[in-house]
Each structure stands twice: as structure tokens, then as C-alpha cells.
Amino acid sequence: MKLTDNVLRSFRVAKVFRENSDKINCFDFSPTGETVISSSDDDSIVLYDCQEGKPKRTLYSKKYGVDLIRYTHAANTVVYSSNKIDDTIRYLSLHDNKYIRYFPGHSKRVVALSMSPVDDTFISGSLDKTIRLWDLRSPNCQGLMHLQGKPVCSFDPEGLIFAAGVNSEMVKLYDLRSFDKGPFATFKMQYDRTCEWTALKFSNDGKLILMSTNGGFLRLVDAFKGAVMHTFGGYNNSKAVTLEATFTPDSQFIMIGSEDGKIHVWNCESGMKVAVLDGKHTGPITCLQFNPKFMTFTSACSNMAFWLPTIDD
């Protein structure tokens, strides 16, 4: 089944889970798309089975809190940042609920975490104005970059380069093998003082970069030239909430939730709005991702909603 405008318009909420007492701050699909794991401000980690559409397990990180949860490549392991006490990144085995390793180094809250799509490398960005490069096998930081402001960062789909958005006004591209030589490309964007960048994501084909903000718009950037291709707006975000935006796996569409529980969908190429879907969420949709392998996506406030198309195209 192929994603088309009509298929996207047909998506409806199939199941809603109310496992959390506070907002879900992050979730991540396993590479196979078979499970999704969430982190919440209520200090819980909930694992869902996407094929059966039900929660499987709940774990807790009461002491440190949990945010920015990410699957690693090993089965049943995740990394996540803390939102209490310290700013250490933790590597957890879900199998026996034990920490495998800690990654200390950041002195302020971690605001970005990206796992390499190809190996055990990951990067983190923090309010301490640094990006750190890590290897899951070592607690020691493998590389450190000092920046001029708050960073957002992400690997490209090949895992060869990573992009850093700095101070909500420039995007720097680094070669992973020689990042200490500085960026090989820098794209300066128009600075908008009304909001700041909250995330940066590559499309699966590596051609596009999506800049999320805590304002009422998103920017779609050409990953090679740095030109802004489209600015998407027209969704509600009056309280400057961090709303997650996402590409569909075919790199053809962009989706974002809003503070009023609706999901807005645009065509990447034309820039046209394709659909507005009502998720009936009780709060702002802080998390939204399309499943990497199956025709389903998930949105979250303090509830998790699983969506399915209602037509066979």
C-alpha cells in the first residue's frame, strides 16, 4: 500500500492508551517497527507492541526521570536522558531493567539525542552549548564541540554526517570521521526572535532537513544547498510548546500535531496542506512519528494514540 493524499486523509485513531499520568515527552519505534517505547514526565517507560496494538511492559526511572528515549541497535536496549538530578545519559537493558552504562559529561539538560542509523555511535546536544559524540561501548565522550548557543542535532540516514542547528539561526553539517576539523557546510537561516528551534530531522532519502520550532511554523530545508524550500504554518501553538514534527517514511509528506489535538499534513514537494486529522487528544500533541515499516503512525499527549488508514488504496 502506497501513501497518497487520500490514504493520509483516511487515517483515524484505532486505539488510545492511557498508561501515563503526565505528558509523554518522547517515543521511538524499534527499527523493525514492531514495538514503540515511550518516556514520560511521570518517570515511566512504556513498551507497546505495534502489531497487537497493546502495552507490553512498564518500567520506571523515578530517581532520574526519563526523556528523549531512543532504541539502540541491540534488541531490548535504549538510551535516554535525565530530566531530574543530573544530566547523565543512561543505557538501559529492558530485558532485566538494569543499566548497562552511564555517559556523564553534560553540565546542563540534554535537549537532543540521536542514534546513528548504522552503528553504536550516538550524539547528544545540551543547554551547556555543546554537542558530544559517544560510543555505546565506552562511558567516555568520543568527541566534543563547543557551540555559540543551544543545539539541536541529528544523524543523516547513512550515518556518515550529522547536522547541528545552532542558536535557532544556522545549520552546520559535519563529517563524522573528521568532525574535529569543523563543519564542511554552514547554512544561515533567517532568525525569528518569536521562537526557537526545538528539533532537526532528516528525511529518509537524506535530501531534506525539517526544522521544528516552538512557534507556529516549521521549515523544510534542502539538505545539500541549505535553501528553505517551504515554511509550513496554520496550526495552533500559542503556548510555545515543543511539538514533534515528522516525515513519512517515503519522504513525501510532513506531519505535525498541534495544541488543540489536531494533526496537520503537508506535501513536501508542493508545500500544499493535504489533511487535518482530529486526534481528540486531551492536550497538545507533543510527540508524533510514523511507523518505519507499517502503515500506521502514533501521536501522544499524556495518552498514546495509534492510527490506521480506513481505505485500501
UniProtKB/Swiss-Prot annotation:
Any one GO biological process: RNA polymerase II promoter clearance
UniProt keyword annotations, A-Z: Chromosome, Cytoplasm, Nucleus, Repeat, Transcription, Transcription regulation, Transcription termination, WD repeat
GO cellular component: chromosome; nucleus; PTW/PP1 phosphatase complex
Location(s), subcellular: Nucleus; Chromosome; Cytoplasm
A Pfam match: WD40
Main location: nucleus
WD repeat segments: 19-58, 105-144, 146-184, 192-231, 236-276, 280-313
Keyword check for Nucleotide-binding: no
Function: Regulatory component of the SET1/COMPASS complex implicated in the tethering of this complex to transcriptional start sites of active genes. Facilitates histone H3 'Lys-4' methylation (H3K4me) via recruitment of the SETD1A or SETD1B to the 'Ser-5' phosphorylated C-terminal domain (CTD) of RNA polymerase II large subunit (POLR2A). Component of the PNUTS-PP1 protein phosphatase complex, a protein phosphatase 1 (PP1) complex that promotes RNA polymerase II transcription pause-release, allowing transcription elongation.
Assembly mode: Component of the SET1/COMPASS complex. Component of the PNUTS-PP1 phosphatase complex.
Record-given protein name: WD repeat-containing protein 82
Organism: Xenopus tropicalis (Western clawed frog)
